[in-house]
Amino acid sequence: ESTRRQRQMCIRDRPYAYDALAAGGMSQETLEFHHDLHHKAYVDNGNKLIAGTQWENSALEEIITGTYQADAVAQNGIFNNASQHWNHIQFWEMMGPSGREMPSELSSAITAQFGSVDAFKEAFVAAGVGQFGSGWCWLVQQADGSLAITKTENGVNPLCFGQKALLGCDVWEHSYYIDFRNKRPAYLTNFLDNLVNWENVALRISG
């Protein structure tokens, strides 16, 4: 295997312990199942699918943008697994046991775009709840620098639309069913209030 492929398509260590998010509402059981089973499956399947193809030595982002909306079934499989791998990398990095206070530069940008932090949170939760079936809810920065809340189905992500992901929440049922059962609104609200590391989110925004 090429070293580039090993770097791009391999499960990363979590940036915190299995029980680090429990106090914030994500149990150790959820993190173990989600990271070690669901996320790992995307990586394993993705590596099998890109073996021997033009994407074998490509960067993860190149694979995603190059296979998005591809006609071939094999290409669709590559996209789904590569995109979900990327999505989960963002998901883990945007959470943490610290960073609950939103830095002033981020809160100012959010307030300027959405009216207030509370209004942003309400809109984010509404978008996540409104995503029918599996998918993701995002806070993105668009090419013109403005912020927007988007939702994407299945494994589609902001890279497909030339947007920068600042914050992403997994709304596939496996991400919340152990801890919240079918209460997706409660899961999304808790994600924003008790799981997001806003300091990490602020580092992603471009001036």
Give residue spans per PLM region.
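Histidine-anchored, small-residue-rich loop motif
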Residues: A20, G25, N45, G168, ...
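An amphipathic alpha-helical core segment
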Residues: A126-N182, L188-E199
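Low-complexity, Gly/Ser/Thr/Pro-rich intrinsically disordered linker/tail segments
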Residues: E199-G207
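Alpha-helical scaffold segments that form or flank carboxylate-/histidine-based iron centers
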Residues: G24-H38, E61-W86, N154-V156, F161-C169
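Active/ligand-binding-proximal structured segments within catalytic/core domains
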Residues: Y42
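Single conserved hydrophobic/aromatic residue that forms the stacking wall/gate
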Residues: E1-R7, I11
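All-alpha RGS (Regulator of G-protein Signaling) helical domain and cognate RGS-like helical scaffolds
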Residues: L37, K48-N57, Q69-Q142
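N-terminal regions that are enriched for targeting/export leaders
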Residues: R12-L21
